[in-house]
Amino acid sequence: MIFSSEDAMNYKMMGKFLSQILIVEAGFMVPALLISLYTGSRAAVYGFGLSIFITAGVGALMYYFCRNSTRRFFAREGMVCVAGSWIAISFFGCLPFVFSREIPNFVDALFEIVSGFTTTGSSILGDVEALSPGIMYWRSFSHWLGGMGVLVFLLALSPNGERGKWYTMHLLRAESPGPNVNKLVPKMRTTARILYVIYMVLTFINFLFLLLGKMPVFDAVCTAFGTAGTGGFGIRNDS
């Protein structure tokens, strides 16, 4: 049996998609690095600096080698992109924990970040307050990012136009059990962006109320992330 090029998986398109996710994730680590620099936590600075370098570097290399991909993007590519995105953000997201030696065991670090991105709220930490501010921020932020779901985040990033329509449709098919999502595509992409704006506004309101309750700014930020994400990651041992 002879297979045409249309039958093959579009690996370059999938690689390009995942590379963009990694570059965005590296950008999300920058605030945690700045917090670590400000608080003088050398181990955390090293952990985030190395993690950003590796994550952005891998993403940049993938983008370079996959930059000339065709636009062919079907349901099978969508499934791989959704599954691959979960694996990639979890693997690279746990690196700051490991490199800073604050959660030195890779399996424990992976469990902690997956718990954050999935808003499970379970933790292997016996003493949360021992974490440096930068690591604590990253842990809480993973909760906030996962609160709206990785799929919604991917939809919010998808491009406009006909190409974006194909991205959105097949990403939705990868996670939605319904038989037909084609009619939802234009609205879903716009809705995803609107939802993130609402989510950020609600998080900010949450933050303001915590400040009114005399909570320190940093604690209010981390707590707002944890509560908005509904997973319940706390920053105190007795929370």
Which stretches of residues belong to each language-model region?
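Membrane-proximal intracellular helices of multi-pass ion channels
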Residues: M1-S239
